[in-house]
Amino acid sequence: MQTHSHAITFGADAWSILSDIELSIKNKIEAAGTPLKDWDVDIYRGVLTGYNDAFIISSEKREEILGNCADESEKQRTAAIIRPILRGRDIKRYGYVFAEQYLIATFPAKQYDIDDYPALKDYLLAIGIERLEQTGEEHIINGERVKARKRTNNKWFETQDSISYWDEFSKPKIVWAELSRTGNSFAYSDDGAMVLNTCYILSFNDNEFHEKELNTLLGFLNSKVALFYLDIISSKLDETGWRWLKQFVELIPVPVQLIFKEDGQLTNKDSASINAQLYEQLGLSPDEAEYLDHII
């Protein structure tokens, strides 16, 4: 049997050579699906602090800061901006492990007055304004060279990125790490957890509650079909690592009409069952289904 290969271009930075069977699978996915970028969803990168050693704290440090508050009012204000944070390593397929890490969420977009948070201010001052300021300058302190965060217009106590989309973290959402050694590692979050800049979040761009839709989409994103498509449109980190960057994830065609049928919900978290449903819905041949089961 003669095997053909086809060079496929996906953009300036992504191209792939596909076999006949890979091209057939790709075409069936695209025929049935709508790219995520054309959905009513938003995808955002997680929070870039510019200095995680200061802005990411343990539960013990959080309790210490709250314990140093002068009164209950200050304590409540301060607790409200010390938020649970997920790192890439914390996010697994269909879930995550909260490692008791917290983010000091002083986002520039929120325009906080640090003097309203004396205990938090004291904690940050102890680290040093010279290290936290966003000037890009270098200082010599006690004979040690200290490099400030990169130059921005933000204040010394604020995160490096403005995070104008801060309210998206409070919505029900899908979260994932940019780098993955296990293929697909998407999880559902409805507890208001934030994520670091090595992760992404996806939420619907309205104020409706979309738990069912998000969990169905989650099943698809954790499927062999989604992993296959990412594999052919992006450059892998290495032989066993994938990069789930926004620019690639938003290109994945999601078969909206198929996966949201009442009798076709992909919410049982059973990978084999979800893959089998998708193979049938996409009209994959037995050879194509077997190919996805064994090649990815």
Place the predicted regions along the sequence by residue.
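A conserved non-catalytic segment of reverse transcriptases
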Residues: 1
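Polybasic, glycine- and aromatic-enriched phosphate-binding surface used to engage nucleic acids
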Residues: 4-261
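Extended amphipathic alpha-helical segments enriched in small hydrophobics
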Residues: 248-282
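Conserved AMP-binding
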Residues: 276-296
